[in-house]
Amino acid sequence: MMLLDLEEKTRVLIEDIVERSAIGSGSIFVLGLSSSEVIGGIIGKASSREIGQRIVKTILEVLEPKGIYLAVQGCEHLNRALVVERELALAKDLEIVNVLPTLHAGGSGQLAAFDYMEDPVEVEEILAQAGIDIGDTSIGMHVKRVQVPLRPIISELGGAHVTALASRPKLIGGARAEYLADPIRKN
């Protein structure tokens, strides 16, 4: 996959997921990324710093003008901690942890987040409103309930399977209750 094609497909994916998940300024968007899978390898075995940089930079170019924060999930070697802007961590009172990602502990996406964010820190956990999983990294633990699967308009990025999640408030009250319109499914 050519790098410009990778950037364009990433941009299309993120713009589509942001629109369909109905998130806006102040929201958090989580990224799970296996650059190994993108280049056709096995998750965690062929990490590519350049692929991570291209994807994260492109995602930030889409999210930042909309006021949406990016949280980049690390691998299980870092207990799936996330890189976020310090501003977000302090505003949301997130638990900051002391670790610096490497290519094989945290991964290429986290390294890229440290390259492109203004004041990046690692946090232990987060509850994002939506997210994208590039390479079956399992982002579900970081997306708030109730999670709504979104079928991405592009199902693979390079060799990586792509899935996405949005979230909506819980519906409570049962048969007698009335609800606001669902902005994700647009009932």
UniProtKB/Swiss-Prot annotation:
InterPro entries: Antibiotic_NAT-like, DUF436. It comes from the Bacteria. Pfam families: DUF436 (PF04260). Belongs to the UPF0340 family. NCBIfam families: TIGR01440 family protein (TIGR01440). This is UPF0340 protein str1894. It comes from Streptococcus thermophilus (strain CNRZ 1066).
